[in-house]
Each structure stands twice: as C-alpha cells, then as structure tokens.
Amino acid sequence: MGFAKYQEDIVSRYVGDLAMRSTKEPASAPKKPCPSASNESDQRINKMSSLKKFAVATPRPLPVIVLADTSGSMGENSKIEALNAAMKEMVSTFAQESRLRAEIQVGLITFGGKAQMHLPLVAAHGVTGVSEFQAGGATPMGAAFDLARQLLEDKDRIPSRAYRPVLILLSDGQPNDDWEAPFNALCNSERAQKAVRLAMAIGPDADVAMLKDFANDAEAPIFKAHNARDIHRFFRAVTMSVTTRTASQNPDTSTAFVVPPPDDDALDLDF
C-alpha cells in the first residue's frame, strides 16, 4: 500500500504541474505568412505600369541644317535680303509646329569669307530671333562641308534616336577652296547618306553640277532660283515638306517636295 500511495502522489504532482504551465504560458500568436518573391515582383510591375500612364513621351529631334552661301556676290540684286526673309519665315513656322512626335531643330552654317556656325543646332521653338546674314568675302564651301559632317557625326548633338536629318545647300557661285574631298566625305558619311539632301542654285553662275551631286532626292531635283521671289518659294517648299513629316505617323518617311507657283501680281527682276 505504501508504494501505491507513492506512485499516486507522483502522478498527481505531474498533472498539477502541467495544469499550472498551461495557465501561465500565453498562447503564441499565429505566424503571418511571408510574402513570396513573385508577389513582390507583381506589386513592382503594377506600380511601374501605373507610373507609365502618367509619363509624357519625349519627342524625337528632326534636324534641319542649312548651308548658306553668304559670299560677296550674294549681296547683289537683293539675294541676301531675300534669303534673310525666307530663313526667318521658315524658322518662325517651325517654332509653331506640334512637338507630339518630332521636335524640329535648326542649324545654320554660313560660308562667306569663312565657314562658321551661324546658329548652333537648337530646337526651333526656342529660337527667339535669327541674326541676319551679311554678304562678303569668297566662297569657302569645302570648310562648310567639314562643319556639316562634324555636326552630323556628333552623337551628343544629333542622337541615334533622331529622325532623318534634312540638309540644304544653296549657293550662287563656285567654291574657291579645296572642296572636293570634304564634299565626298560629307556625302559618303553614313548619316548624310540617310539624310534628305536638297539644293538650290541661285542665279546663272552657281555650280549646278556640284549642287546636283549634293541633292539625293529624286522627287526634289536641284531648284534653280532666278530671282528673289524664287528663294522664298524654295524655302516654303522646304517648310511644307518638313512640317508634313512632323505631322505624319512616321516622320522618317519622305514627303513630296512641291514648290508653290509664283504670285502673278509680284514683279521681280531676274538675277
């Protein structure tokens, strides 16, 4: 009987201890499930998609680069005055164009006495005024070709995302420097080959053969300006061609180059 009583006491104390522990130790809180990596990735994607709805697409640049003869002979018969007026009209029209897909940029290279950047390549809408060309000096066209090639190949000025550039060459005379090598280097450069190249011969003394070699658009052969009015007509055609590209679904697509007819009531003497 003594041993049985001893076992009973041990069992009683063990059961009592268990009961006391169950009342003292609080129940542990349920563990929260850890988010899976896939859930976190989905959340990030959803946030990025929401931000894209509010992002504004940056228009791609469409460079228009003019190489203008400003030599002494351009000061005759109001040629330089007509050129100045036509340039201002073109840049002003470009500045008002929509920039939804393409942003027109304008750069002006002059060659008269020396070749120089008259207007660095800038967005047309940011041009507040174009200083007038002054006629004087000889015709260093080769140096102008070098400047144009360097500008075209400058990836900081004309990034790879830019639309096809427009190159415009106009002259009323013959180059008087070593121009053939720079001319070939420009025309054979990768970007110049892809560019739309337009040319205008002003007056009877222009180097028509060289200007024809420069122009590469079968739809826009060399334009011959016989008077000041023709200079305006040429640049209006340039303006229409470029602005039509900016409004199209694909501004890289070439557009028709149509020179408007002369005004019947406008009297103008030939150069």
Which residues make up each language-model segment?
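Von Willebrand factor A/integrin I-like adhesion domains
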Residues: 204-252
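Von Willebrand factor
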Residues: 56-119, 166-170
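Acidic, polar low-complexity linker/tail segments
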Residues: 7-14, 18-65, 70-81, 153-160
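Extended acidic, low-complexity intrinsically disordered regions
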Residues: 33, 203, 228, 250-271
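VWA/integrin I-like adhesion module and closely mimicked acidic/polar interface patches used
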Residues: 173-217
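Short glycine-/polar-rich loops that comprise or flank the Walker A/P-loop
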Residues: 61-62, 164, 193-196, 217-220
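Short beta-strand-loop
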Residues: 3, 102-132, 208-216
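Short, charged loop segments at secondary-structure junctions
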Residues: 114-147, 174, 191-193, 220
